[in-house]
Amino acid sequence: MITTESSKKNASQMAKLLIQKKLATCVSIKQISSIYKWDNDIKKTEEFEITIKSKPELKDGLINFLKKITTYDVPQILYKKYNTEMKYFDWLDKTI
């Protein structure tokens, strides 16, 4: 799952909460530039992309939790089912 946050501090806090609440086994954070339309203007914002590694069965709980803790009015929450190497999946499965 992928979401974004406005600051590294918020992104790091979100990552720690997701792992503590056992909604994710690993969270990656990287700085990005986003260009988008908002209120009829084209905006450019520096923000932080958060990639959340989790189990498919936790998707709904994860989405609900992200909606509660995000700082955005309209949060980006993207999800897709991925295939992965079995050792990684086993680690993910045992960690959550």
Which positions does each model-derived feature cover?
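Positively charged, small/polar-rich N-terminal and surface patches that mediate targeting and assembly
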Residues: 1-96
